[in-house]
């Protein structure tokens, strides 16, 4: 999903990461891979049917591209990048820390690296 940033984009970061330590590790690695400060990468969580879900987001041209952390729709993100004339390249591969999320592609842009799930 893609939406514009608003003032309500916030919090619950540590709580989400504490509830899912392994996922928290993945999120931190993802943010580090982006090469941006955590303040510029909004992470927030919410309850959905008693299940805590974490979402990560990447800021691109003042828009937020976000998805469930374990399912990033590659087509949606690629369409977004194309529609906004953002140059990108695609890297395929597996890394041990991310094997549970494979198959996936890495979409590399000047704004950072996006991890996209394949279906």
Language model features: what each stretch is:
Residues 22-40:
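Active-site rim helix/loop that mediates acceptor-substrate recognition in acyltransferases
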Residues 59-119:
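Acyl-donor-binding surface of acyltransferase catalytic domains
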Residues 1-13, 94:
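A short beta-loop-alpha structural element at the N-terminal edge
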Residues 5, 35-36, 81-83:
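Structural motif
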Residues 7, 28, 74-75:
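Structural motif corresponding to alpha-helix initiation and N-cap regions
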Residues 15-19:
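Short Lys/Arg-enriched alpha/beta "domain-start" segment
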Residues 1, 40, 86-89:
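Short active-site oxyanion
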Residues 34-59:
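Conserved beta-hairpin
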């Amino acid at each position: 999903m893609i939406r514009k940033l608003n003032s309500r984009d916030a919090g619950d970061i540590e709580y989400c990461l504490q509830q899912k330590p392994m996922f928290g590790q993945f999120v931190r690695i993802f943010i580090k891979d982006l090469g941006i400060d955590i303040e510029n990468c909004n992470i927030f969580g919410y309850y959905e049917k008693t299940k805590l879900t974490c979402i990560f987001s990447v800021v691109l041209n003042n828009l937020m591209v976000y998805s469930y952390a374990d399912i990033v729709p590659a087509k949606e993100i690629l369409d977004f990048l194309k529609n906004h004339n953002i140059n990108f390249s695609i890297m395929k591969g597996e890394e041990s820390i991310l094997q549970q999320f494979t198959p996936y592609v890495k979409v590399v842009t000047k704004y950072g690296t996006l991890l996209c799930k394949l279906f």
